[in-house]
Amino acid sequence: MVQSSLRFNGSVWCNLDIALRNLDQLFGRAIQPLGLTIIEWYILRALYERDGQHASELARAVGRAATSFTPNLDKLQQKGFIERRPDPTDRRAVHIYLTSLAEQHREEVLNSARLVDQQIRKMFSDEEFETFQSIVAYLQTLEPDYSENSSDYKNGQLGERRG
């Protein structure tokens, strides 16, 4: 494992942000041959897990605000990977479905994640990697408030833990 001091006086957020940006770069290079952006890749992964999600559900699944999510879906639709279908019970809502093109690329998309995960895993001992995964899993249980009027930060709360 690489030992180095943390930047910004050990600020968790700053250092985690830097680490995530570095991983984004690694992952971006891995998916570049697929012609996808990282957010498009996330959307496809979420749909491979459960096709036909409401657009708002899908936005939450990939950690985005529903209000700014539509352009991502537009681009994936233009590339031929998804299609929108109206919700029969709610005319304001749409379900997002994979196309046959997306199904043709399923293994490539899923394999790109496996390759990056394998590279990262090699950097750590098994015990360190298990600890890392536990921390990430815990951080994912925080319930963010994606509304524009959120007062969580002002009140000293970054989010509540789910489950």
PLM segments and residue spans:
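N-terminal leader segment of winged-helix/HTH proteins
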Residues: M1-L34
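C-terminal regulatory/oligomerization modules of transcriptional regulators
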Residues: M1-S5, D126-G163
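Long, contiguous secondary-structure blocks with strong helical propensity
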Residues: S5, R60-K79, T131
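Active-site phosphate/pyrophosphate-handling residues
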Residues: S11, Y42, E130
